[in-house]
Structures are given as structure tokens and as C-alpha cells.
């Protein structure tokens, strides 16, 4: 007969709770043994930190007046450090700089600069033809020879060529130059190169950078000395004022390097007739700081293909290129002194469009033609002095020599003497007065003075913040699931062999057909099949 033994075990809810707690504690201890250690609390971190005063203010121990005073001292020191750090940062962000001057030792030979000169009068009156006067009427203010202001009927003037007009009607150096000497050697007009500027046809001495003339000594007599006749009788009469009308007499001079084009209408200085002008020069090599200390143009930016027509970048070349682009965009042509191969503007466009365009361009940092200074620049410092010429004796001599009267000599002749004061160059270099290394040094000193900290102390604090934050994130991500529990207990079904091994009471049932019945009540299974007998065992 098959026997099924069912043992119903019911636990009280009060008995189950301690067991669940014991199991939970065992699981927690097991997880703690297997998982990472819990992060240190603030008191433990403060007691081991290298930040001075933090352990006494926040470390383990009783709270009292002493700890409060330490906390106040720590906060005061921290506030003082932050104030000093902010002051240092503000000083660093102003990017202060200083200029260091270093006079170089005298050199046996120094390269002589380029000297550009222009007669202030642009057109010679005697060289102007009727067609020139007609085309240049708005530019010069001269009226056409026809009283009605128009050319004669049937007379056709050729189209004007501004380059030809300037080249033909400008003052010729061969006529102006009366004497020329360089370092004791004779020179002539062939040693000058023609260059066009806002003053028209001009001339540059020592213009070729590949064959620059050397100066072997300093002082007068070792540079360029020229005598010029400015030809005032060729100056245009003034009938009415225009933008090109000039009331001066003399020449404009600019001393510059060979790599820099002349920008003489703004950078030149005037030399008057009736005087001998002495220009003492000194070479100056300037080094400027790039961003963020200054606005100079670094070497890496100088080789851009935007300054076509010039071998090197310079402020003058940049300005001329910018002016050309503006005139070309508005007037669809360029002026004679501007680089390029575009069409030259006719005279009427000069006065109607080009001059107005140039006047509208700003030269400041906010204008469309802002040109930064190169970070490495060579310029020539000048000291100018003059004496009156000629004296009475030389006036009569020069009048006889050049077949002029003394009044003409006094009104037209001038002498220009350009020389090196000494064969030394002066180096001026901008240097950062407060750099990053100085800022870090000052911050480290203030940090050590007020809070006794260092870079490693900051790393300790960051490491502690990371440790605490990472532990909080892991707790959020790995929340344990709540186990399902029944409120009444549970029923466990055991097999016969398990029940016999675990039960303290012996079996009391008999097989089918036995004589004695079980001592347990309800020994007949109500759900058993007919003809079968089930016996219950209770423990």
C-alpha cells in the first residue's frame, strides 16, 4: 500500500522575524566581506588630511570652544587666501609687460637705410599740356584754357594716362639734384629709384635690399648728403582750393628699411628750403609681445598671400593693400601708388571717388584698415636739427655757380644730411612682467602661508569627493530587491525518508489489512481512492 506522509509545519510570525533578521545580517556581513570598503567619513578624512587646521576643526573628538575657535581660524585663513588669490588672478589677467633696452656693441659696418624724398608739388606747371590741364582741372583746380570751361569744338584730347602724366609732369631728380655724396663718394640721380606715392613721382636712395649700401662710420660725412633745388617757379598757381591744394614749399622725406614701402604722406617729415637739415639716425630693433599681451603679428602669420606685391609684411604694405582693396571695390580701379596690375583710375575718378574713399578709411584699431605691428620690427630713430643757408658769401657763390640770383638760392635750395649717430643698434624688447610661472609661485606662497596646503592637498580633497560621490552612485544603482513574505507562515512538504530522519516520533501506521488501527485520529484519508488507506503522521 502506498503511504504519503504530509507534515504541516506552521511558524508564528514572531518566530520568523528573528530568523529573517539573522539571515539578513549574515548576508550583509558576507557582502561587506566581499565588496569594497565604505568611504571614510568627514572626521576620519579631516584627521588624516595635510590641510593645516582641518583635523582640529573637523576631526574626531568632543565639540567645544576649542574646536569652534579652530574652525573660525580655518575659515578666516581660507577667506584671506581666496582674497589674495583673486587679487593675483586680476593682476595676471591685465597682462602687464615691461620694456627691456639693450644697447648693442658697436659694429664695424651697419646697413644704411632707404631714404625716400618727394617734392611737395606734384605737377610742374611748365610740363602740363592743354590736355593735361583739361583732364586735371578737378584735381589741380586750374581752369581750362577755354574761357567757357570746355575744350574747343572739334578738338579731341586723348584718354588720360595717369602714370604717363605723373612721370612726365613730375619734378625730375636730374634737374633738382645739385650735389650728392655718400660716405665721401660722389653719387648721382642714377643711384635713386623712382617710386610713386600720394605726392606723385618720388625717389628712393638705397632702395634695393639685395645690394644695400653699408655705412662704415658714424657722424656727419659718413652718410648721405644732397643739395636740392625744389623749383618753386614750377609750383602750380592756386585758382581754387581742392583736396590736392598745397600751400607748402619743400620736400617730404621718409627714412625706412628696404623691406618697407614708403608711406610718406603720413610717416614723412618736411625739409624746408633755405636750411641745411641734419638727421641723426639710430637703428632700433623692436620685439613686441603677441596675444594676449599685445596686438603684434607673429611670425607664423606673416607669410600669408594677402600682401601681394611686397616681399615682407609691414604696416605700410598692409595699409596700402587695404586702401587698394577699398578703392578697387568702390571705384573699380586703383591709384598709381597702389600695388597690383588692375586698371589705373583716370584723373576725374581720383577727385570724385578715390580721394573720398581714402578719407573715409580709419587708421585706428576699429577701422577697416587696422594693420597690426609685426612682432619683430626694425625702425630708425631720428634727431633733426637745422641751420640756415646760404650765408652771404655762399649765396653769391651759388648764384654764380648755378646761374641764379641770390633770392632764388635762398627760396629754393636746401641741403639734407642723413647719417648714423653711431654704428650701434638699440634693442628694445617687450617682456611679460607677470607670467604664469610667477602667478603659480605667488599662489603657492599664499596657499602655504594661510592654509598650509599644496597641490597634493588639493588632490586629497578631490580624491575624497570622488570617493564619496562614487559610493553614493553605487548605492543608488544597486538597491536590493525587497523579498516577498506571507503573513501566515508557510507549509513545507517533506518526503517520507526525510520525515523519518528528522521526526523524533516513530511511525504508528500499519499496512492495509493490519489488525490494529492507528492511534492518530482521522486515519482514513478523506481524499484517498477507494480501497486505499492513508495514514497521517504528526510531529
From Swiss-Prot:
Extracellular compartment segments: 90-438
GO-annotated biological processes: behavioral fear response
Region of interest: Disordered: 500-531
The entry's keywords: Cell membrane, Disulfide bond, Glycoprotein, Ion channel, Ion transport, Membrane, Sodium, Sodium channel, Sodium transport, Transmembrane, Transmembrane helix, Transport
Pfam families xref list: ASC (PF00858)
Glycosylation sites: 191, 243, 341, 376
Record-level GO cellular component terms: plasma membrane
Location of the protein in the cell: Cell membrane
Chain span(s) of sequence motif GAS motif: 452-454
Cytoplasmic side: 1-68, 460-539
Source organism, top-level taxon: Eukaryota
Membrane topology: Multi-pass membrane protein
Main subcellular localisation: membrane
Quaternary structure note: Homotrimer. Heterotrimer; with other ASIC proteins producing functional channels.
Family, similarity comment: Belongs to the amiloride-sensitive sodium channel (TC 1.A.6) family. ASIC4 subfamily.
Protein name per UniProt: Acid-sensing ion channel 4
Protein's organism: Mus musculus
Amino acid at each position: 500500500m502506498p503511504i504519503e506522509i504530509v507534515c504541516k509545519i506552521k511558524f508564528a510570525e514572531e518566530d520568523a522575524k528573528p530568523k529573517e533578521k539573522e539571515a539578513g545580517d549574515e548576508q550583509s556581513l558576507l557582502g561587506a566581506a566581499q565588496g569594497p570598503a565604505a568611504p571614510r567619513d568627514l572626521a576620519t578624512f579631516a584627521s588624516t588630511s595635510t590641510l593645516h587646521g582641518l583635523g582640529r576643526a573637523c576631526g574626531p573628538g568632543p565639540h567645544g570652544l576649542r574646536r569652534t575657535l579652530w574652525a573660525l581660524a580655518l575659515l578666516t585663513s581660507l577667506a584671506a587666501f581666496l582674497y589674495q588669490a583673486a587679487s593675483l588672478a586680476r593682476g595676471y589677467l591685465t597682462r602687464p609687460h615691461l620694456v627691456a633696452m639693450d644697447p648693442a656693441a658697436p659694429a664695424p659696418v651697419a646697413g644704411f637705410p632707404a631714404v625716400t624724398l618727394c617734392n611737395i608739388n606734384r605737377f610742374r606747371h611748365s610740363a602740363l599740356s592743354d590736355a593735361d590741364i583739361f583732364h586735371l582741372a578737378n584735381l589741380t583746380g586750374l581752369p581750362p584754357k577755354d574761357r567757357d570751361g570746355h575744350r574747343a569744338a572739334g578738338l579731341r584730347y586723348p584718354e588720360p594716362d595717369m602714370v604717363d602724366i605723373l612721370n612726365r609732369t613730375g619734378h625730375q631728380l636730374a634737374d633738382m639734384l645739385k650735389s650728392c655724396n655718400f660716405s665721401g663718394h660722389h653719387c648721382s640721380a642714377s643711384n635713386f629709384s623712382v617710386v610713386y606715392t600720394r605726392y606723385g613721382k618720388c625717389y628712393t636712395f638705397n632702395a634695393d635690399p639685395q645690394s644695400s649700401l653699408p655705412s662704415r662710420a658714424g657722424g656727419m660725412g659718413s652718410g648721405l648728403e644732397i643739395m636740392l633745388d625744389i623749383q618753386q617757379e614750377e609750383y602750380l598757381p592756386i585758382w581754387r582750393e581742392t583736396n590736392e591744394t598745397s600751400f607748402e614749399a619743400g620736400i617730404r622725406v621718409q627714412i625706412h628699411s628696404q623691406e618697407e614701402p614708403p608711406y610718406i604722406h603720413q610717416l614723412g617729415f618736411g625739409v624746408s628750403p633755405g636750411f641745411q637739415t641734419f638727421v641723426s639716425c639710430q637703428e632700433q630693433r623692436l620685439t613686441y609681445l603677441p596675444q594676449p599681451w599685445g596686438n603684434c603679428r607673429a611670425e607664423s602669420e606673416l607669410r600669408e598671400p594677402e600682401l601681394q606685391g611686397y616681399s615682407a609684411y609691414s604696416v605700410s604694405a598692409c595699409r596700402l593693400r587695404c586702401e587698394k582693396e577699398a578703392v578697387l571695390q568702390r571705384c573699380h580701379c586703383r591709384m598709381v601708388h597702389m600695388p597690383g596690375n588692375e586698371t589705373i583710375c583716370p584723373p576725374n575718378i581720383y577727385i570724385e571717388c578715390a580721394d573720398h574713399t581714402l578719407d573715409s578709411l580709419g587708421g585706428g584699431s576699429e577701422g577697416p584698415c587696422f594693420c597690426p605691428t609685426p612682432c619683430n620690427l626694425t625702425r630708425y630713430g631720428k634727431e633733426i636739427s637745422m641751420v640756415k643757408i646760404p650765408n652771404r658769401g655762399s649765396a653769391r657763390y651759388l648764384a654764380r655757380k648755378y646761374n641764379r640770383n641770390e633770392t632764388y638760392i635762398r627760396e629754393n635750395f636746401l641741403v639734407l644730411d642723413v647719417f648714423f649717430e653711431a654704428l650701434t643698434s638699440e634693442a628694445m624688447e617687450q617682456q611679460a612682467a607677470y607670467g604664469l610661472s610667477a602667478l603659480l609661485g605667488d599662489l603657492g606662497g599664499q596657499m602655504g602661508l594661510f592654509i598650509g596646503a599644496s597641490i597634493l592637498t588639493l588632490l586629497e580633497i578631490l580624491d575624497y569627493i570622488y570617493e564619496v560621490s562614487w559610493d553614493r552612485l553605487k548605492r543608488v544603482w544597486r538597491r536590493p530587491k525587497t523579498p516577498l513574505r506571507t503573513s501566515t507562515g508557510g507549509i513545507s512538504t517533506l518526503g517520507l525518508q526525510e520525515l523519518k530522519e528528522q521526526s523524533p516520533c516513530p511511525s504508528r501506521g500499519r499496512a492495509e489489512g493490519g489488525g490494529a488501527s492507528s492511534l492518530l485520529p482521522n486515519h482514513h484519508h478523506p481524499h484517498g481512492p477507494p480501497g486505499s488507506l492513508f495514514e497521517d503522521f504528526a510531529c
